[in-house]
Swiss-Prot record:
Cited InterPro entries: aa-tRNA-synth_I_CS, aa-tRNA-synth_Ia, Leu-tRNA-ligase, Leu_tRNA-synth_edit, M/V/L/I-tRNA-synth_anticd-bd, Methionyl/Leucyl_tRNA_Synth, Rossmann-like_a/b/a_fold, tRNAsynth_Ia_anticodon-bd
GO molecular function terms noted in the UniProt entry: aminoacyl-tRNA deacylase activity; ATP binding; leucine-tRNA ligase activity
Entry binding sites for ATP: 637
Name this polypeptide is given: Leucine--tRNA ligase
Signal peptide: none
Protein origin, superkingdom: Bacteria
Annotated catalysed reactions: tRNA(Leu) + L-leucine + ATP = L-leucyl-tRNA(Leu) + AMP + diphosphate
Family as reported in the entry's similarity comment: Belongs to the class-I aminoacyl-tRNA synthetase family.
Keyword set, alphabetical order: Aminoacyl-tRNA synthetase, ATP-binding, Cytoplasm, Ligase, Nucleotide-binding, Protein biosynthesis
BP GO annotations: leucyl-tRNA aminoacylation
Record's keyword annotation contains Disulfide bond: no
A Pfam entry, by short name: tRNA-synt_1g
Localization annotation: Cytoplasm
Length: 871
């Protein structure tokens, strides 16, 4: 038996044993409670980084802990394997996307297996496998049958040189194509959408059910859904028999409308534009069409607009207001038209100032209008007194309506409802509930994705691919040039097919699905991952779901998590699931940060200097000798501050890496990588190793503990059961792994100071090894076998603490004189207030400080202190 901890000698051996015993396999249904532990599956980039290691370590601790608590656990792994990088690799390196992806999967699987994670690899799936995307396509057809999938025109990024559609990440900050350098245009193409808006209300309301989710994630989703209640108002257009419909959450400001704004894409744009303005408007629309949605709505850029020459009538005042077109109004949002109220909206105020438009204040602070007659008139558009206020910026606070006809003098809060009711009576408006959420555009003009399983027939229209013909497989003999759109459009042998309904020559859909589709249901496939006959056996999935603990980054707070919730609800409504929400509890782990140095931006880009090139005592740029900023930042190649997992593991072992990751910071916080702290965890595991091996070598007593324990034994037993209670609560309730490991350190310290011949010591050694097992599984299992056990430690039952053992015979009583601590004594734990005062008075400490003084008052805080107030 080696007296020194040698991780390299035990880790591979332990992993081999776990594999032979099948410890990680998902058990069948039984009377045991279930626990589904899941980390967000990775994109197979080919290289594991420390962020991955942290994510999967957290989930692994939970899975191991729950197994030892008697749960049947599923802890699977898969690959989010479709996506743009594989196509780029095909273009740049001539490697087919499938080959590149599967090579990366093989490499990353080996890296993950090296970590010794308790993953059931028999559940493994890859979204790019036909065995998986067959069912992704089947789910698409379920959406189509339910009326939740449809086509309409939508704008895409278009490279005019390469004649191809670009993803947002392929467009640089200057609006140029990453490959050709061409100025990217916006182009309308017919695209597929999912009607997620049909579920907006339920997605919003059911956030209240997610009691195990971080509040900030729920708030982010609520804001993304963006429910608001406001008014739908119609403004007649002068000269044509049309009305401009606007949606506003501020109907109380309608008397302050000084212009209307249409989105450039609005269908009324051409009709309201006068001949005099037509040429200028067309130029403006062309310019805006080449801007991304992000550019148009950015808070950092000034808003641009142009008058159409057309005018509309404010139905409340009868006054004419000019109609403008502006880049910041998007047709997909609301009605594609907004009313401009610069007096009471910050954005409108800036726009009006820029274009010299009227600013009409119709709400004011009560203090500012205290001397005015604000009695409303009987005429809805009349005013009793023109109230002038001199605000230097938009007034956006609640207030009193002024210059607002019959609504003058009432609060802006009350005016909202009153104005909507009036508009409804006059038939030019109504109350409306609106959502910021828009339908989900799922079309991608790319090759490496799940083909959309429909056929376009000139006679029958859109025809679903029959279930028996699924999957619609991606063709393999494809040339990747990065030009002329998706390679699928060029393959006539693949595109041209007979219509399944009438037999007429027809064409396949050449768009593929957004990769978020694949990740919106993968967690439902894991419990029945090898099912070839159906998407999954509902009885199995309903048994295992929902996921009890989901772990992943905050960057997925909105899209992935929202889409997964949407899919779950749709499949429930299709009769496949019997639950409403997919993820019971969510943990968003922090980033892993590494030390780096920064030479701040001085007219150019920030310059990152790797720490290995810098003298930490006097950090300076090695090229310019300028002083550098020392900081921790998210690990990346550009910053040169990454730490390769394999380097840490080869030097310290897997368990040390796990212990550092778990101890350094709470899981939801960012973690700063510090090798000194890694070494600290390595020393701790060495101490545990020596404690156990010294105990074994010494051959000390292992007889069962007797009821008649010495004072020291009682204290040791209390330390043991305090550790059991604390570690259990830290892992089970809040996932405070760092404080759990602190408790393990306290227990090891207590054992180091204890009598090695005591039977309680034997209990403590075995308890320490069991408690450390979820955190450092290799060393724990090895020590368990060295203790003479034949079974794996990971099959042991998690210990329960004995409440009686936690009760101390004695407590520490602090002695104070005039509120100042003078020392402490040990007293019986059950002593009452009178006894505590007696012990304190008789103590040597009190005698020393109160001798010769008159005691005026004694304050006793039971279980804590006695304070003497003296003259």
């Amino acid at each position: 038996m080696d007296s020194r901890y040698n991780p390299a000698a035990i880790e591979e051996k332990r992993q081999k044993t776990w594999l032979e015993l099948g410890l990680d396999k998902t058990p069948s249904a039984s009377n045991k409670p279930k626990f589904y532990a899941l980390s967000m599956f990775p994109y197979p980039s080919g290289s594991l980084h420390m962020g991955h290691v942290r994510n999967y370590t957290i989930t692994d601790v939970i899975a191991r802990f729950k197994r030892m608590q008697g749960y049947r656990v599923i802890h699977p792994m898969g690959w989010d394997a479709f996506g743009l990088p594989a196509e780029n690799a095909a273009i740049d390196r001539g490697v087919p996307p499938a080959k590149w992806t599967y090579q990366n999967i093989t490499q990353m699987r080996q890296q993950l297996q090296r970590l010794g994670l308790s993953i059931d690899w028999e559940c493994e799936l890859a979204t790019c496998s036909p065995d998986y995307y067959k069912w992704t396509q089947w789910i698409f057809l379920q959406f189509l049958q339910a009326g939740l999938a449809y086509q309409k025109e939508a704008a895409v990024n278009w490279d005019p040189i390469d004649q191809t559609v670009l993803a947002n990440e392929q467009v640089d900050n200057e609006g140029r194509s990453w490959r050709s350098g061409a100025i990217v245009e916006r182009k309308l193409l017919r695209q597929w959408f999912f009607k997620i808006t049909d579920y907006a209300e339920e997605l919003l309301n059911d956030l209240d059910k997610l009691t195990g989710w971080p509040e900030r994630v729920k708030l982010m989703q609520a804001n993304w859904i963006g429910k608001s209640t406001g008014a739908y108002l119609e403004f007649p257009i002068v000269g044509i028999d049309e009305k401009i419909a606007v949606y506003t959450t501020r109907p109380d400001t309608v008397y302050g409308v000084s212009y209307l704004v249409l989105a450039p894409e609005h269908p009324l744009t051409n009709r309201v534009t006068t001949k005099e303005q037509q040429a200028a408007v067309e130029v403006f629309i062309k310019e805006v069409s080449n801007q991304s949605e992000l550019e148009r709505t950015s808070e950092d850029k000034p808003k641009r607009g142009i008058p159409t020459g057309g005018v509309a009538i404010n139905p409340f005042t009868g006054e004419e207001v000019p109609i403008w077109i502006a880049d910041y109004v998007l047709y997909e949002y609301g009605t594609g038209a907004v009313m401009g109220v610069p007096a009471h909206d910050v954005r409108d105020f800036k726009f009006a100032k820029n274009y010299d438009l009227p600013i009409n204040f119709v709400i004011a602070s009560p203090d500012d209008v205290a001397g005015f007659d604000l009695t409303p008139t009987s005429e809805i558009d009349g005013i009793t007194q023109l109230v002038e206020v001199d605000y230097k910026q938009a007034y956006t606070e609640p207030g009193i309506l002024i210059n607002s006809g019959a609504f003058t003098g009432i609060s802006s809060t009350d005016a909202k409802q009153a104005i909507i009711e009036y508009a409804e009576k006059q038939d030019f408006g109504k109350v409306r509930v609106q959502y910021r959420l828009r339908d989900w555009l799922i079309s991608r003009q790319r090759y490496w994705g799940a083909p959309i399983p429909v056929i376009h027939c000139p006679n029958c229209g859109i025809v679903p691919v029959p279930d028996k013909d699924l999957p619609v497989q991606l063709p393999e003999e494809v040339e990747f040039t990065g030009r002329c759109g998706s390679p699928l459009t060029q393959l006539e042998s693949w595109v041209n097919v007979p219509c399944p309904t009438c037999g007429t020559p027809a064409k396949r859909e050449t768009d593929t699905m957004d990769t978020f589709i694949d990740s919106s249901w993968y967690f439902l496939r894991f419990p029945d991952a090898k099912n070839e006959q159906q998407v999954f056996d509902s009885s199995k999935v309903n048994d295992w779901m929902p996921v009890n603990q989901y772990v992943g980054g905050i960057e997925h707070a909105i899209l992935h998590l929202l889409y997964s919730r949407f899919f779950t609800k749709v499949l429930r409504d299709r009769g496949l699931l019997n639950f409403d929400e997919p993820f019971q509890r969510l943990l968003t782990q922090g980033m892993v940060q590494g030390l780096t140095y920064l030479n701040p931006n001085k007219g150019g880009k920030d310059k990152w200097i790797p720490s290995n090139l810098v003298n930490s005592a006097d950090p300076r740029d090695p090229q310019t000798d300028e002083p550098l900023q020392r900081l921790y930042a998210t690990m990346s190649k550009s910053k040169g501050n990454g730490v390769a997992p394999e380097d840490v593991i080869s030097k310290y072992g897997i368990d040390t890496a796990r212990m550092f990751i778990l101890f350094k910071a709470p899981p939801e916080k960012d973690l700063e990588w510090d090798e000194a702290d890694v070494e600290g965890q390595f020393r701790f595991l060495n101490r545990v190793w020596r404690l156990v091996t010294d105990y074994i070598t010494a051959g000390v007593s292992r007889k069962k503990a007797q009821s008649d324990l010495t004072k020291a034994e009682k204290e040791l037993r209390r330390a043991i059961h305090t550790a059991i209670q604390a570690v259990t609560e830290d892992v089970e309730d809040e996932y405070q792994f760092n404080t759990a490991i602190s408790e393990l350190m306290k227990l090891s310290n207590a054992l180091s100071d204890a009598d090695k011949n005591s039977p309680i010591y034997a209990e403590g050694i075995r308890t320490l090894v069991i408690l450390i097992a979820p955190f450092a599984p290799h060393i724990a299992d090895e020590l368990w076998h060295l203790l003479g056990e034949s079974d794996s430690i990971h099959t042991q039952t998690w210990p329960s603490f004995d409440p009686a053992a936690l009760v101390a015979d004695e407590i520490t009583l602090v002695i104070q004189v005039m509120g100042k601590t003078r020392g402490a004594i040990q007293v019986p734990a059950q002593a009452d207030k009178a006894a505590l005062e007696k012990y304190a008075r008789e103590s040597e400490i009190a005698q020393r400080y109160i001798e010769g003084k008159e005691i005026k008052k004694v304050i006793v805080v039971p279980g804590k202190l006695v304070n003497f107030v003296v003259s």
